[in-house]
Amino acid sequence: MGCASAKHVATVQNEEEAQKGKNYQNGDVFGDEYRIKPVEEVKYMKNGAEEEQKIAARNQENLEKSASSNVRLKTNKEVPGLVHQPRANMHISESQQEFFRMLDEKIEKGRDYCSEEEDIT
C-alpha cells in the first residue's frame, strides 16, 4: 500500500483557470446586481429647498421652546431631583486617609529633594 498523498497529481493551472481564480479573488465574478448603480431621484430628494425651510422653521420653534423652558427652570431656586447631594455613605479606608494626609503635606512643603536634582530649563 502506498501513501495517499503520493497518488495526487500536481497540475499547473492554465491561463483561463488562473484568470477565473483571480476574478473570484477580486470579486469580478459577481453579476451586475452587486455593481455600483447610479442614484435614482426619489421623493425625499425633490423639493429640497422647501423641505429645508420647513425643517429650519421647526428647529427654530423647538429652540425657542427649549430656551423658554430653561428660563423657567433657572427662575426656580431649587429644582428637586436635579441637585446632586454629596455622598453620605462613602467609605474611605484609613490607608486612603493616610495617603491623602501625606500628599497634602508634600504639597505644603513644596519640591522634594528628588525634584530639586532635576534641572528644569
UniProtKB/Swiss-Prot annotation:
Keyword Phosphoprotein on entry: yes
Keyword entries, A-Z: Phosphoprotein
Presence of keyword Phosphoprotein: yes
Modified residues annotated as Phosphoserine in this record: S95, S115
Pfam families: DUF4612 (PF15389)
Tissue expression: Expressed in spleen, prostate, testis and uterus.
Residue span of region Disordered: 1-28, 60-82
Protein name: Uncharacterized protein C1orf21
Gene giving rise to this polypeptide: C1orf21
